[in-house]
Curated annotation (Swiss-Prot):
PANTHER family: TRNA(MET) CYTIDINE ACETATE LIGASE (PTHR37825:SF1). The lineage of its organism: Bacteria, Bacillati, Bacillota, Bacilli, Lactobacillales. Keywords: ATP-binding, Cytoplasm, Ligase, Nucleotide-binding, RNA-binding, tRNA processing, tRNA-binding. One of its GO terms (biological process) is tRNA modification. NCBIfam families: PRK13670.1 (NF010191). InterPro entries: Rossmann-like_a/b/a_fold, tRNA(Met)_cyd_acetate_ligase. ATP binds at residues 7-20, 101, 153, 178. This is tRNA(Met) cytidine acetate ligase. Coiled coil: none annotated. GO terms for cellular component: cytoplasm. It is found in: Cytoplasm. It is an enzyme of class 6 (ligase). Its main location: cytoplasm.
Length: 385
């Protein structure tokens, strides 16, 4: 039996995500599809626009059989850590086939993963502080293997391939060409499939008139979006971030995960006069750091995620089961006793005391305050029949 895996954020779930699930199902009609999905915070350092339970339900309604939460400790990270965590967890759950969307599905990603893993580690110790790490990495990959990977989904795809090739048994990779708008398109396009970025932007600017989104969303998802009273975004959170930076000492800021090279001084210096989050990012931006890297740092700061806490979380890695259907339930019964990765179906004080789940539950407290609904305690996996 083949087991299909997909790494996702679904922020929010749209027709492009449904297309990828359909492509996976065409290849393997009766085998389980497992989704490893980011929770209430996503890779580029922001809150998800819908909570993890609603997004998991959308995936199940569109063909996924099991949806697990990728812990915050891996979800809000650069591509290599994000990919490494998600691929290892999927592999542990028995996944043998990985489906992912890319701009160019003709590349041999397994070959790229093998070649990049052969590059000596000291060749990746980039020292050019006038360029971002991502830029230097992409230039190195282009130089070593002859392919540029400067588009967001291509970068993630290569990271998946690198992580897969580090497994004892690498996954079979199935790249699927993305349809419709580009990953970062800001505005809705006259296409069947829009970018998640454009959909989020539309929600923020037209919260009381979302009917325009209907053609870009699977059945039922427009109604779910319309029910929301709040669409989380950094403008909502900026005053909390401002208070956090202004009230924290330099020593406290220095302890934050990924705080480096004197960024605590720059944040302290610029936060007081910043009018909004966008202007603050511009003020602390340098050639060394991408905006995504700085957004993640701001999120770690807002949530008070320290280096010590992040590293401690990796000593006890688990995943929260968000939902399943009958095929997913049957597969889970079959593998549960043999899987090393702890699968959490119910959050309680004991399992939420430490590890990735402990950090996840703690940072979700802010999301709960914004959205007004519990995200962990008292919640059980969604069952779709």
């Amino acid at each position: 039996m083949s087991v299909i895996g997909i790494v996702a954020e679904y922020n929010p779930f749209h027709s492009g995500h449904e297309f990828l699930l359909n492509q996976a199902r065409l290849v393997s009609e009766n085998d389980p599809i497992i989704v490893m999905m980011s929770g209430n915070y996503v890779q580029r350092g922001q809150m998800a626009i819908m909570d993890k339970w609603q997004r998991a339900k959308a995936a199940l309604n569109s063909g996924a059989d099991l949806v697990f939460e990728l812990p915050f400790s891996f979800a809000v990270q650069p591509a290599d850590i994000f990919a490494n965590g998600s691929i290892r967890m999927l592999s542990n759950l028995g996944v043998s086939e990985l489906f992912f969307g890319v701009e160019d599905a003709n590349l041999n990603f397994s070959y790229l993963g093998q070649k990049i893993n052969q590059i000596p580690k000291n060749r990746m110790d980039f020292r050019d502080y006038t360029q971002t790490y991502a830029t230097q990495y992409n230039e190195m990959v282009a130089r070593e293997v002859g392919h540029e990977v400067n588009q967001p989904n291509m970068m993630l795809a290569v990271a998946y391939a690198v992580a897969s090739e580090q497994l004892d048994t690498p996954l079979h990779l199935h790249p699927v060409t993305r349809l419709g708008s580009g990953h970062d398109d800001q505005l809705l396009q006259d296409k069947i499939i829009s970018s998640a970025t454009a959909i989020r932007n539309y929600c923020l600017h037209h919260p009381n008139d979302l009917i325009e989104l209907k053609k870009y969303l699977p059945k039922g998802e427009l109604a779910a979006l319309e029910k929301q009273k709040v669409y989380p975004n950094w403008n909502l959170l900026f005053n909390f971030l401002k208070y956090r930076i202004e009230s924290a000492s330099l020593e406290e800021l220095r302890s934050i995960y990924q705080m480096s090279e004197g960024l605590e001084y720059k944040m302290k210096e610029e936060i007081h006069n910043a009018e909004d989050f966008t202007s603050f990012l511009r003020q602390i931006k340098s050639k060394r750091y991408t905006y995504a890297r700085l957004r993640r740092l701001c999120l770690y700061t807002l949530l008070n995620v320290t280096e010590k806490e992040m590293q401690a979380s990796y000593q006890d890695v688990s995943t929260l089961l968000l939902g399943y259907n009958s095929r997913g339930r049957n597969y889970l019964k079959k593998i549960r006793k043999d899987v090393e990765l702890p699968i959490i179906s119910k959050v309680d004080k004991k399992n939420a005391a430490s590890g990735t789940l402990g950090l996840q539950v703690r940072v979700d407290r802010l999301f709960e305050q914004i959205m007004g609904e519990d995200q962990n305690f008292g919640r059980r996996p969604i069952e779709v029949k």
